Amino acid sequence: MKLQIIFTLAVLIFFIGTKSSYAAGIEITDARATPEYWIDRNADGDELLFTYRQIENINAEILKRDNYSADLKNYPETISAKDLKKRIEKLTDDVNLESSWAVRANRNLNALNQAVNVRYAVTTERVNIRLLPQPPTGDKYDSVQGTALDPAEAVAVLWESKDGKFSFIQARYYFGWVNKNSLAFTDRDTWLTYLEPENFLVVTTNKKFVRVNDKLILFQMGAKIPLENLEVENNLWTARLPIIENGELQEISAQVLNDDKVSTEFLPCTTNNFIRQSFKFLGDIYGWGGLDNSVDCSAFVQNVYRSMGINIPRDADKQEGCMPIFAVFNNVTTAERLDIVSRAPTGALLFKPGHVMLKLGNDDSGKPIIIHAASSYYSYGEKIYVRKVLVSDTSYQNYSGTPTLESLTGIAFPR
């Protein structure tokens, strides 16, 4: 009984203490919005949480559960018309898109009546994956936008749109339609050197631009940049990047500055690296499905995790369904919810319908604090758009006035 009273008082303090600041917005801008605040609290923050071998096992288990991801190295050379048609239709079934007859007809499903031979290609720039074969609309919440792929990503090409402008592809963690002009087609042996490059840099900052000819191409955190070798000359790496000539892949050398924005290996998986990596996105614009060359909530946490070599699914619902479970919120009181969230480790992912957040820790008052790519929140029934990566607590509300703490469905963390 005494413990229950303490929890109840803690919850009351939690909500009363945030009421005045909530009216001014959900973003925390004091010392808690700095990585140093959290790193200084972790005496063992740089100790390794998972070894490389353990991360391999974690990735393998997640891959088994995620029906959007694929083991491309062992991908079949052919795919049946039935299976491919089901996959193409799954994209629109999952999100119930409203679209014109012409756009749906452009999927060219009437011509899909026999097994298809898989072709191999590599992305030459950051490219959008679309749920239907149509270009972006310019809408900040374009419902046909799936995600975005980095340059130099190996993909399996499965089908083409009726107008010949889009290819239906399977990437490591997503499938959908991409602009065919962003794909360099090649043979499987060359393709494998991009799927598993022998020498590469890992992008450890939120965004890294590399000049290829007269164009800057964008790599996001966790992306691999293939290298010609591991030699540094004049503080520059020499990248090996794909371009398109006569419709096929050719390679070009590009210079990459040897700075703290890249590493020759994935970062160690530590508590402090969850903090450091997440704060590199602080203030970035919210980019639905990777639009605006940025991240939404699930891409944000995916990139933080992959910078340490952990491959989690792209979408929040898949992340919650495929990652190891820390907690599920079924029939628990508010006090119990607060206790569970307080015990979740730094780097844990907190889920509520349509959103995912990364836990930073508990502040000096014991309040759990999160960092996330937030689109909007509600205040007194009014929807307020923030559209940025920010630090907050879990008191902000949804459309029905329910605080985030009360709407959490689960917490996930590798193990």
Labelled PLM ranges:
Residues 142-175:
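A conserved hydrophobic secondary-structure block that centers on an alpha-helix together
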Residues 152-153, 220-228, 346-347:
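Loop/turn positions that initiate beta-strands
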Residues 142, 260-265, 283-292, 346:
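Second-shell loop/turn segments in exported
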Residues 8-15:
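Bacterial N-terminal signal peptides
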Residues 148, 313-380:
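...with weaker cross-activation on analogous glycine-rich loops/strands in unrelated enzymes
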Residues 274, 288-318:
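Active-site nucleophilic cysteine motif
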